[in-house]
């Protein structure tokens, strides 16, 4: 299984890159992962709701163009209205995808969310938390949770949950 993280935005603070890279390095023996940075739409200073919809549409087109929909790559989208999973449930979901031979493209949308087209194309909508998290921090939290889930699946002692 290969997991690609499609993330809108780039030029993360050094501490974000450091945290992300630490878990990215740790997970590689268990799961091949790749970060794909997608350009964020250029934003106006005081955008209208119509502008925000345009940004989501532009970023959504980039996400869908990058997603390998003609392959076995499933599209998982982070969305505040998505299904919340425990770490153990995430481990099960990753295990299921591996067993059937699916690859996964996991989407971190832009600062204004994801387009309706991306949500409609999603095979799974996942909510990391009901909290509003800073966009860059999601990268670190996501990679740590993926590593923790894969540690469970590989009987690695990192996860000490129940």
Swiss-Prot record:
Gene3D superfamilies associated with the record: 3.40.1280.10
UniProt catalytic activity: pseudouridine(1915) in 23S rRNA + S-adenosyl-L-methionine = N(3)-methylpseudouridine(1915) in 23S rRNA + S-adenosyl-L-homocysteine + H(+)
Assigned keywords, A-Z: Cytoplasm, Methyltransferase, rRNA processing, S-adenosyl-L-methionine, Transferase
Subcellular localization: Cytoplasm
Top EC class for this record: transferase
Nucleotide-binding found in the keyword field: no
Keyword 4Fe-4S: no
Name of the protein: Ribosomal RNA large subunit methyltransferase H
Native source organism of the sequence: Psychrobacter sp. (strain PRwf-1)
Gene (UniProt): rlmH
